[in-house]
Amino acid sequence: AVSRGVAVVGTGINPGFVLDLLIITLSGVCADIQSINAERVNDLSPYGPTVLASQGVGLSPEAFAEGLEAGTVVGHIGFPESIHLIAAAVGWDIERIEEKREAIIAGVVRETPFVRVQPGQVAGCLHTAVAYRQGEPIITLSHPQQIHPQLEGGETGDRIEIKGTPDVRLCGSPEIPGGPGP
């Protein structure tokens, strides 16, 4: 690539593609942009114990809160980096980013080969990041990750909404699969 003067971009599904490069690509059709909102709802059930633990799956709500404080429950990794990448691509300066992680509480039994979640326990983590520009929210990324969302009427998928000229809305369901991790 260097000898030919070209760039090569390699990405994962998320982070990398869905809540990063795909948003940037879609923004290219806009003459101006007022805001960007994106959400990725995925099913964690194919993933292993390391990923499930990082989302607090199987914990009590109290243990989830303790895990947030201790740094063992992390939610999605990479929201600040994704936001800064998007902002740089569209020419925005970001003042601050606020992140929020909330437990998704199961109302029914949800089970994977690695964990059985009872009603009242944590089935996943809703992680949201909001970037501000000139005091206003300008980029919102949301990632509710949980095991078997369909058991309570949830549907996996990826959604991107760009408010601008023109408005752009892209929705895909089911989610673009990211592949199981450890």
For each predicted feature, which ranges?
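C-terminal helical cap and adjacent loop that interface with cofactors, partners, or active-site loops
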Residues: 1, 147-182
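A contiguous active-site-proximal alpha/beta segment in oxidoreductase catalytic domains
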Residues: 1-44
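Short amphipathic alpha-helical segments, especially helix-boundary/capping motifs
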Residues: 2, 57-63, 167-169
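A short glycine/serine-rich beta->alpha loop
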Residues: 5-11, 70, 173-181
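Glycine-centered flexibility sites
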Residues: 10-12, 16, 91, 164, ...
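Residues in flexible loops and secondary-structure boundaries
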Residues: 16, 41-46, 67, 168-170, ...
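Catalytic-loop motifs flanking and including active-site residues across diverse enzymes
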Residues: 18, 78-82, 182
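Active-site-lining helix/loop region of Rossmann-like oxidoreductase modules
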Residues: 27-158
